[in-house]
Regions:
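Hydrophobic/aromatic beta-strand patches that form the interior of the parallel beta-sheet core
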Residues: 18-22, 105-107, 132
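Short beta-strand/loop motif that positions the catalytic acidic residue
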Residues: 100, 105-108, 112
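Conserved alpha/beta-hydrolase "acid-adjacent" motif
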Residues: 113-119
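Conserved alpha/beta-hydrolase catalytic His-Asp/Glu region
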Residues: 48-89
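Catalytic histidine-centered segment of alpha/beta-hydrolase-like enzymes
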Residues: 114, 131-151
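Flexible "cap/lid" loop of the alpha/beta hydrolase fold
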Residues: 12-46, 81-92, 144
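Short, conserved loop/helix-junction motifs that constitute active-site signature segments
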Residues: 13-14, 96-101, 125-126
Length: 154
């Protein structure tokens, strides 16, 4: 949802030297260009239970990454995170994105279990955004040692 949210505030980032979409799209809930609608709605319907376990396991490529995350998990309550998803979904449904060039390039993880990689690639292709694929899960950051590595990923 971060790629979508950052795009909504794009005017605040106009002076940024490099803007990278990482494992997301400007249309985050979309059958062709984001999380398929039915999948997202099922996730939302079962969010309280899902956010207790399986969801976060799906964010990572492997058990080792999940173990690292588990040492410093999200501190917000499940109710708060569910509310955030519900509010974001309402915003997504009520926002018409007429994409203007913003992202310099996109990083898409081959093994993203949250947003189908083929949908991300289709979205970035439609928006003429160069895409680099990497062999990671939805949260690729444990595989980089610095922001410079991410920037040089292109």
């Amino acid at each position: 949802m971060g790629v979508f949210t950052a795009y909504l505030f794009k005017d605040l980032f106009a002076n940024f030297e490099c803007k990278i979409a990482i494992n997301g799209t400007v249309t985050p809930v979309d059958n062709e260009f984001g999380i398929p609608v039915k999948m997202f709605e099922l996730t939302l319907k079962h969010a309280e239970k899902g956010l207790e376990g399986k969801f976060y396991q799906n964010v990572f490529l492997n058990e080792n990454e999940f173990v690292i995350y588990s040492k410093t998990p999200v501190q917000r309550s499940i109710e708060n995170r569910v509310s955030e998803l519900e509010n974001l979904y309402e915003l997504i449904k009520n926002t018409n994105i007429n994409y203007e060039k913003f992202y310099d390039f996109a990083i898409v993880s081959d093994f993203d279990k949250i947003i189908p990689p083929k949908n991300q690639i289709a979205s970035h292709k439609k928006n003429n955004t160069q895409t680099k694929t990497v062999p990671y899960g939805h949260f690729p950051f444990y595989n980089f040692s610095s922001w410079d590595e991410i920037i040089k990923c292109r």
